[in-house]
């Protein structure tokens, strides 16, 4: 039985920080957004959680839809819940981290006009609060 709430609901999204080794350190996978908000800006692969999927399944689906990459093992990194982090409204993002092999092939699709690997030391300007997300991810992987 469905229940209708009388108060506004938050939106739930997932993002994937995917890292691969490179000659000069690590690289992170980013997509160029095809649609507003932040059309044409670089961002982490991610999107909205469907009602019939788990958070990790949503992260894997969004990663595959936007980059063609399959990463079996994703680990929850952090929940980002800043009140004004998304211009579309109140949005909570659960971020996952995973690793890809050096020769991993990617191909932009769905909401991404392109996808590419970037050195942590040469990141483009990022959409949303993804600079903070990557700062946290970099600290996490340096502690391994």
Per-region residue spans from a language model:
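N-terminal strand-loop-strand
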Residues: 1-43, 56, 71
């Amino acid at each position: 039985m469905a229940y209708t709430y009388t108060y506004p609901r938050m939106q739930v999204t997932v993002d994937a920080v995917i890292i691969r080794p490179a000659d000069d350190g690590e690289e992170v996978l980013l997509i160029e957004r095809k649609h507003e908000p932040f059309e044409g800006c670089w961002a982490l692969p991610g999107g909205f959680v469907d009602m019939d999927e788990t958070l990790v399944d949503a992260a894997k689906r969004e990663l595959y839809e936007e980059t063609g990459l399959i990463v079996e093992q994703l680990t929850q990194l952090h929940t980002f819940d800043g009140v004004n982090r998304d211009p579309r409204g109140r949005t909570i993002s659960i971020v996952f981290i995973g690793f890809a092999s050096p020769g991993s092939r990617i191909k932009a699709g769905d909401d991404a006009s392109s996808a590419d690997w970037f050195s942590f030391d040469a990141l483009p300007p990022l959409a949303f609060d993804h600079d903070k997300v990557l700062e946290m991810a970099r600290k996490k992987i340096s502690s391994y």
